[in-house]
UniProtKB/Swiss-Prot annotation:
Changing T76R: Abolishes hydrolase activity. It comes from Homo sapiens. Substrate binds at D77, K146, G147, S148, Y149, G150, N151, G152, H182, L235, I271. This is ADP-ribosylhydrolase ARH3. One of its GO terms (cellular component) is nuclear body.
């Protein structure tokens, strides 16, 4: 993509790097992706026409100007965990693994019917045990000591990128926050990649090539450690699986036309972090430019959500990750009020974003 086109796409009132608009847009985009995407979760294939009908139902009713939407779309464990993470950061004004782990577990105990996976429920139950002294141990014990490589650490991580402005801190605390539930490097490296994508989006990068180059540089370093190499090898995967998928994203973006089936075949749409985080990044980058199948009335953030959901599979999580990146990039101006007001918890989400900006953003 030409640098000028991407720079123009980033305009849209997002303002300066790490602006309040970007913070609000990030969490609003994540909430939208979860709420809208959950309607299609676990559908192997999703008809684009159906998605377009679904999102058009969120638009204001003609003939009733000024009418507000009411909350109709419920959030899942994706948003529940993302909110608990942010609430911990705000309560401690820093990353605190014990507080965050307890908030995750208490959130599950309070409201268990949000679509949590069986594996993470086991972790939460152990964390709720007063005898638990090491909050990382329950996750390490999963899957015969190999840990989980699911996308649960990545789906909730955006708050880390909002709270910390340095790449080093983003990587460090994304890893630690993910390791509370996902001890495999293939799980926590996915969370780091997602956090880095949000981090870069908050800066307003100037080209997709540069965006990918920066992500690739970070991930090649991270995936070069012995544990990452071992974990990939044990699954029969290529070394540096995230790096290889970032390269594949570049190849797909260079092609004039790519079908949804090709995207799913090359990048995935599953619950594994390596089958969903790169996919979310691709959705964000691809949808900076118009899509002939998506009406031009939809802006870039809306297009990102629509396209990511149309890939099927783990739609709520891929869309919440793509929405977080796009929202951080475009800012609050591209979040449609009627869509936002259709989502459960939208007001609290916005308050959390504003609080994060007030507490963590240095003027």
């Amino acid at each position: 993509m030409a640098a000028a086109a991407m720079a123009a796409a980033a305009g849209g009132g997002a303002g300066a790097a790490r602006s309040l608009s970007r913070f609000r847009g990030c969490l609003a985009g994540a909430l939208l992706g979860d709420c809208v995407g959950s309607f299609y979760e676990a559908h192997d294939t999703v008809d684009l026409t159906s998605v377009l009908r679904h999102v058009q139902s969120l638009e204001p009713d003609p003939g009733t100007p000024g009418s507000e939407r009411t909350e109709a779309l419920y959030y899942t464990d994706d948003t529940a965990m993302a909110r608990a993470l942010v609430q911990s950061l705000l309560a401690k004004e820093a990353f605190d693994e014990v507080d965050m782990a307890h908030r995750f577990a208490q959130e599950y105990k309070k409201d268990p019917d949000r679509g949590y996976g069986a594996g993470v429920v086991t972790v939460f139950k152990k964390l709720l045990n007063p005898k638990c002294r090491d909050v990382f141990e329950p996750a390490r014990a999963q899957f015969n000591g190999k840990g989980s490589y699911g996308n649960g650490g990545a789906m909730r991580v955006a708050g880390i990128s909002l709270a910390y402005s340095s790449v080093q801190d983003v990587q460090k605390f994304a890893r630690l926050s993910a390791q509370l539930t996902h001890a495999s490097s293939l799980g926590y490296n996915g969370a780091i990649l997602q956090a880095l994508a949000v981090h870069l989006a908050l800066q307003g990068e100037s080209s997709s090539e540069h965006f990918l180059k920066q992500l690739l540089g970070h991930m090649e370093d991270l995936e070069g450690d012995a544990q990452s190499v071992l974990d990939a090898r044990e699954l029969g995967m290529e070394e540096r699986p995230y790096s290889s998928r970032l390269k594949k994203i570049g190849e797909l973006l260079d092609q004039a036309s790519v079908t949804r089936e090709e995207v799913v075949s090359e990048l995935g749409n599953g619950i594994a972090a390596f089958e969903s985080v790169p996919t979310a990044i691709y959705c964000f980058l691809r949808c900076m430019e118009p899509d002939p199948e998506i009406p031009s009335a939809f802006n870039s953030l809306q297009r990102t959500l629509i396209y990511s959901i149309s890939l099927g599979g783990d739609t709520d999580t891929i869309a919440t990750m793509a929405g977080a990146i796009a929202g951080a990039y475009y800012g609050m101006d591209q979040v449609p009020e009627s869509w936002q007001q259709s989502c459960e918890g939208y007001e609290e989400t916005d308050i959390l974003a504003q609080s994060l900006h007030r507490v963590f953003q240095k003027s």
